[in-house]
From Swiss-Prot:
Identification of the protein by name: DNA ligase
Stored PROSITE patterns: BRCT (PS50172), DNA_LIGASE_N1 (PS01055), DNA_LIGASE_N2 (PS01056)
SMART domains for this protein: BRCT (SM00292), HhH1 (SM00278), LIGANc (SM00532)
NCBIfam families according to UniProt: dnlj, PRK07956.1
GO molecular function per UniProt: DNA binding; DNA ligase (NAD+) activity; metal ion binding
Keyword check for DNA repair: yes
Active site residues according to the UniProt entry: K126
């Protein structure tokens, strides 16, 4: 029986390669959604996501709960209050060709009796901005939030209030009790250019593109700054709606209704019936793209009939009734001047193309990743080649081809290193893996640096006062060698570093001190054991409950943990067999890092285990997040919408349309008190 990580399909794709693809996508999502600092073009992300979807479709047994295909995006920043979306804000599936549009239409046939080719669609330009939710209570703007990860976003109410085309009060006499408007906030090109001109005059940093400018403006902690930015909203849909009056029964009519009550809607929205009209809209909006005055990157096509939308439903991260048909990414030619080789946390050697600077899709590009030796071979690329780079609203482009007829006579072959460019240890490539790795381990300065950066990262120990530049200084001066050394730093030591004043030094020490109180799962993830990601770390914590049990676990016992196979179990065992690792962990514990052991409570005859539960209304004894966490601890799936598959609706005060729908469907309704009694939390 082959190892799971060694299993491969007929094309030679292995599970390990699939998991590497997932990890790459997770990193790209974090930089795009959380840091507003994308690493790759949208086109490259979309291509990788499409590749992952296709592989998982071919191998459903390889799908894991933490796959990027099973969620929407990334978690919100900690600088803003968090808002839970009552109805998840899902993203859209993408199409990149007419054939993929045909596939989208064809997939509908399994869910509706109507011929998809005869359906009316509401067609909209795909705006390149930031998705937001704006809640009106009794006609007055009450709360606004970013999409975040689709379930939880950031509270940006104060900033949204500063956007001139968003009404603070709806233009109607009898407004709904609650109306959630969903739309895209973006920055028109003229406003973007003026913003950058002012920044240049003041000697300030400019924005790379309008999307980054819009995202940065919305996430200002000071609304006065946001008010000075030329932001605009275009609504594209409705979320929560509570009123005695019924909404229109088509998507197009709902948008026109929003427009009539003062909500801005895009002027290019059209109705189209059938494939040919959909393609005509796509071609038309693409032709208008240069003259619209704002950035778009495709066309959004939505089934117009709301009843059919409900029949079609959703998959894990997107609706079946809508698709984003994206434009081809913009391409330019430039020259490959050199290739540098970078060393990552696990020793992975990554070739980085150094390019003759070229202006592509609004940004000057001079670097591109070449991924690995296989990619260099596939492209047939050599130093001196003229290459085609593709970029779609991002900073780091993708090299998609070589212009062979322009190859110079003095072109130089790219030599993949056999020794680490940092520590000169041997470089090896394990059979079945695309990545070559430095064997130096923590002897390698590059791996130590990346390991420290991982240790302090948000999803690990979350030491936000210790960034990349500080780590580099600490290592250069040999003040820090292991993660445990961070907890031994003193104020006077930090004060001697460049650009480190008394306040900055104290902030760093405060962050380090705060990080001592963590969780077992975070600590395990922070250790950087290869292939032990967030989900695996959480599974280990849930299974063994404490660190001593994990350290003592045998190879066989580790494989009893969910999603831990032979390869991961072997890596965990080897980690604890290395005396240096044990010393570092014990040193960390001695510095005061602590957590509460995971306690698993088994409840006999648990009536909630495996049930689908929806929360609605205002809870008085628990917050919404507390109730959700409590339900999940009982093994429930907490959903944002009521359907025939819902087992329980927990109704707080002022429960609205969800309660009505639950009663119509015969879903069992619990009051907050009944719910608390059922869980034994009173």
């Amino acid at each position: 029986m082959p190892l799971l990580s060694q299993m491969q399909d007929q094309s030679g794709t292995t599970f390990a390669q699939l998991e590497a693809l997932r990890q790459k996508l997770r990193e790209y999502e974090y930089y795009y959604h959380v840091l507003d600092n994308p690493l790759v073009p949208d086109a490259e992300y979309d291509r990788l996501m499409n590749e992952l979807k296709n592989l998982e479709w071919q191998h459903p047994e390889w799908i894991t709960a933490d796959s990027p295909t099973q969620r929407v995006g990334a978690k919100p920043l900690d600088g803003f209050a968090q808002v839970t979306h009552e109805i998840p804000m899902l993203s859209l599936d993408n199409a990149f060709s007419d054939e993929e549009l045909d596939g989208f239409l064809r997939r509908m046939e399994s869910y509706i009796t109507e011929d998809p080719h005869t359906l009316a669609f509401c067609c909209e330009p795909k705006l390149d901005g930031l998705a937001v939710s704006i809640l009106y209570v009794d006609g007055v703007l009450n709360q606004a939030a970013t999409r975040g990860d689709g379930s939880t976003g950031e509270d940006i109410t104060s900033n949204i209030r500063t956007i001139r085309n968003i009404p603070l009060k709806l233009n109607m006499d009898n407004p709904p009790a609650r109306l959630e408007v969903r739309g895209e906030v973006f920055m028109p090109q003229k406003g973007f250019e003026a913003l950058n001109e002012r920044a240049l005059e003041k000697g300030e940093k400019t924005f790379a593109n309008p999307r980054n400018a819009a995202a940065g403006s919305l996430r200002q902690l000071d609304p006065k700054i946001t008010r000075q930015r030329p932001l605009v909203l275009n609504a594209y849909g409705i979320g929560v709606y509570e009123s005695d009056d019924e909404l229109p029964v088509t998507h197009f009519e709902r948008l026109q209704w929003l427009k009539s009550i003062g909500i801005p809607v895009n002027n290019e929205i059209r109705l189209a019936t059938g494939r040919e009209q959909l393609l005509a809209f796509y071609a038309d909006i693409q032709a208008k793209r240069p003259t619209l005055g704002y950035d778009i990157d495709g066309a959004v096509l939505k089934v117009n009939d709301i009843g059919l939308q409900e029949q079609l439903g959703f998959i894990s991260r997107s609706p079946r009734w809508a698709i984003a048909y994206k434009f081809p990414a913009q391409e330019e030619m430039t020259v490959l001047n050199d290739v540098e080789f970078q060393v990552g946390r696990t020793g992975a050697i990554t070739p980085v193309a150094k390019l003759e600077p070229v202006f592509v899709a609004g940004v000057t590009v001079s670097n591109a990743t070449l991924h690995n030796g296989d990619e260099i071979e596939r492209l047939g690329i050599v130093i001196g080649d003229t290459v085609i780079i593709r970029r779609a609203g991002d900073v780091i482009p993708q090299i998609v081809g070589v212009v062979m007829e322009r190859r110079p006579e003095n072109a130089k072959k790219i030599e993949f290193p056999t020794a680490c460019p940092v520590c000169e240890s041997a470089v090896v490539r394990v059979e079945g893996e695309a990545v070559a790795r430095c064997t130096g381990g923590l002897f390698c300065g590059a791996q130590r640096k990346e390991a420290l950066k991982h240790f302090v990262s948000r999803k690990a120990m979350d030491i936000d006062g210790v960034g990349e530049k500080l780590i580099e200084q600490l290592m250069e001066r040999e003040l820090v060698h292991t993660p445990a050394d961070l907890f031994k730093l003193e104020h006077t030591t930090l004060m001697r570093l460049e650009r480190m004043g008394g306040k900055s030094a104290q902030n760093a020490l405060n962050s380090i001190e705060k990080a001592k109180n963590t969780t077992l799962a975070r600590f395990l993830f922070a250790l950087g054991i290869r292939d032990v990601g967030e989900a695996t770390a959480q599974n280990l914590a849930n299974h063994f409950h404490n660190l001593d049990a994990i350290r003592a676990a045998t190879f066989e016992q580790l494989q009893e943990v969910q999603d831990v196979g032979e390869v991961v179990a072997n890596r965990i065992v080897r980690f604890w067999q290395e005396p240096h690792n044990v010393t570092v962990v014990e040193d960390l514990i001695s510095q005061g890092i602590h957590w509460q052991d995971v306690v698993q409570v088994e409840i006999a005859d648990n009536p909630l285990k495996g049930k689908s539960v929806v929360l609605t209304g205002t809870l008085t004894q628990l917050t919404r997040d507390q109730a959700k966490a409590l339900l999940q601890s009982f093994g429930c799936k907490v959903s944002g919408s009521v359907s025939s598959k819902t087992d329980y609706l927990i109704a707080g005060e002022k429960a609205g349309s969800k309660l009505t729908k639950a009663q119509e469907l015969g879903v069992k309704v619990l009051t907050e008190q009944e719910f608390i009694a059922l869980t034994g939390e009173n």
